[in-house]
Amino acid sequence: MSKGLPEARTDTAMSELVPEPRPKPAVPMKPVSINSNLLGCIGIDTIIEQMRKKTMKTGFDFNIMVVGQSGLGKSTLVNTLFKSQVSRKASSWNREEKIPKTVEIKAIGHVIEEGGVKMKLTVIDTPGFGDQINNENCWEPIEKYINEQYEKFLKEEVNIARKKRIPDTRVHCCLYFISPTGHSLRPLDLEFMKHLSKVVNVIPVIAKADTMTLEEKSEFKQRVRKELEVNGIEFYPQKEFDEDLEDKTENDKIRQESMPFAVVGSDKEYQVNGKRVLGRKTPWGIIEVENLNHCEFALLRDFVIRTHLQDLKEVTHNIHYETYRAKRLNDNGGLPPGEGLLGTVLPPVPATPCPTAE
């Protein structure tokens, strides 16, 4: 008996030291998708009409920036895109405004209504870009402006008493105008697109395409695409943002055939075969802006407005703005930029020493 007692005590002591095995946490079940045949109409498809009605009531913002050296018809093209005088031509500037010594940013807002839908359009012009003897880093004020709009939106978003609808001044689309030299891109072109394509949706266009023959235009487009590829520059729509095979197929065709769009702009109408058409009069005849045999303006218009406008806005918000937002919040410890929750500047948090074991 006495020999068995210590063994019993040892067993008890060991059982006290060994913890009971913990039950495994419950694994959440994955939702199972089952294709059910509806027994009748429930009205799911009316969500599209609901969204349409809401958009018609509130309207939507669209902010487009035009960049390129003077004389490439930037304002004319934008006016042609929206069939209204939404961009101020250089010829209407004061004498002092004609040759800015540095790159300036000029934003003009308009409200355009079509079919009951209101678009709050802002056209951002960049006079002075590429017009100086030394154009080094002339893209910096443009990048600064774009980031300032992200910052403005971020401050509104993290505000405790934020507005129900935050005014959106973020640049959704940047049309970059390439001079129709027919040779190659300038170092400035490459430098601009390399930096700005990381923060905004850049769409390259060849300006005044009527100055080139069809063969010259085709060769120049291929050369531009090749130079952008060699320099690792991705323009909108970027391959990595294609959501599915349908998107990829559609966007591949745009990337490989249409880009950069070779365009001609005009806000003047002429009579051609009994029809009034937008065009440019030349000694050889009328260049019809919306005729695909003459230029690719119609492709650009359809791309920017009719097929990809919503995607331009979504990529701006979900990719470019989100990248900026994550970096700013990460740099600031997850708090609003430079401020605490009550709008006061927070002092640095001292490191808490680890408690020493006694």
Curated annotation (Swiss-Prot):
Residues 1-29 are annotated as: Disordered. Residues 58-331 form the Septin-type G domain. One of its GO terms (biological process) is cytoskeleton-dependent cytokinesis. Residues 207-210 are annotated as: G4 motif. Belongs to the TRAFAC class TrmE-Era-EngA-EngB-Septin-like GTPase superfamily. Septin GTPase family. Filament-forming cytoskeletal GTPase. May play a role in cytokinesis (Potential). This is Neuronal-specific septin-3. GO terms for molecular function: GTP binding; GTPase activity; identical protein binding; molecular adaptor activity. It comes from Rattus norvegicus (Rat). Disulfide bonds: none annotated. Keywords: Cytoplasm, Cytoskeleton, GTP-binding, Nucleotide-binding, Phosphoprotein, Synapse. One of its GO terms (cellular component) is presynapse. Residues 1-10 have a biased composition (Basic and acidic residues). Coiled coil: none annotated. Residues 125-128 are annotated as: G3 motif. The modification Phosphoserine is found at residue 91. Its main location: cytoplasm. It is found in: Cytoplasm; Cytoplasm, Cytoskeleton; Synapse. Residues 68-75 are annotated as: G1 motif. GTP binds at residues 68-75, 102, 208-216, 265, 280. Septins polymerize into heterooligomeric protein complexes that form filaments, and can associate with cellular membranes, actin filaments and microtubules. GTPase activity is required for filament formation. Phosphorylated by PKG on serine residues. Phosphorylated by PKG on Ser-91. Brain-specific, with highest expression in the hippocampal CA3 region (at protein level).
